[in-house]
């Protein structure tokens, strides 16, 4: 008999919402994100983006940027080559590439661009930076990130957090972010869903005490 990994009757995420997903290992967070991206097909039910079934059309791919893990990257390219490749997919001009590099200059911290190093040789933290930056290419309306703070040093975590907040303020992006870091996720997201064994246990919205509520839920 198969095991039910996800059992969510209905979950609606609104436009411009900053949505956080938290839960312990094995809760189903990554499975949910992979299902939304049509990388895993549900045995029942469906995922719709802007009212359209993700299995039935590819339109959503033009306005959703995502980074779940390093499998999204191309290991035999350098970061420079990879960004140029993704840039071409979005018809980036030289000026677009220049402004992209400028936006992420602080996060890259002179460790990513122009180093003649293959993506496969990067540290876990720098892989994360490349993936997050690439997710923003093409100015997507929706950005999905799985554990964006994992493997980053404290300075880089703060830079990622500030980047996410600034981009949302400027462009009204819809975020879907899963994280084990309760502090960062509560600073970025005004709505947080707790997932446990594939089910939504709590759906917290706009509470001043969200961090305290999460800590209370997860305490041993």
What are these regions (language model features)?
Residues 45-60:
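Conserved ABC transporter NBD signature motif
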Residues 1-8, 15:
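A short, flexible loop at the N-terminus of ABC-type nucleotide-binding domains that lies
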Residues 22-24:
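The feature captures the beta-strand-to-loop junction immediately N-terminal to the Walker
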Residues 37:
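Helix-to-loop junction immediately C-terminal to a conserved catalytic motif
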Residues 178-180:
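H-loop/switch region of ABC-family ATPase nucleotide-binding domains
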Residues 143-147:
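Catalytic Walker B motif of ABC-type/P-loop ATPase nucleotide-binding domains
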């Amino acid at each position: 008999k198969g095991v039910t990994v996800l059992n969510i009757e209905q979950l609606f995420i609104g436009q411009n919402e900053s949505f956080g997903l938290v839960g312990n290992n094995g809760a189903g967070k990554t499975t949910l994100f992979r299902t939304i991206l049509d990388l895993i097909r549900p045995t029942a039910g469906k995922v719709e983006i802007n009212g359209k079934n993700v299995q039935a059309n590819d339109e959503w791919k033009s306005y959703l940027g995502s980074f779940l893990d390093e499998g999204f990257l191309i290991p035999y390219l350098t970061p420079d080559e990879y960004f140029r490749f993704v840039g071409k997919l979005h018809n980036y001009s030289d000026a677009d590439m220049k402004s992209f590099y400028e936006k992420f200059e602080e996060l890259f911290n002179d460790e990513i661009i122009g180093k003649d190093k293959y993506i496969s040789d990067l540290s876990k933290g720098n892989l994360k930076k490349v993936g997050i930056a690439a997710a923003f290419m093409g100015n997507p309306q929706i950005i999905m990130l799985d554990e964006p703070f994992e493997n980053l040093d404290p300075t880089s975590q703060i830079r990622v957090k500030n980047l996410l907040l600034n981009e949302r303020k400027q462009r009204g992006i819809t975020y879907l972010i899963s994280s084990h870091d309760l502090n960062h996720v509560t600073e970025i997201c005004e709505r947080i869903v707790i997932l446990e064994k594939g089910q939504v246990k709590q759906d917290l919205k706009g509470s001043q005490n969200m961090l305290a509520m999460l800590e209370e839920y997860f305490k041993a």
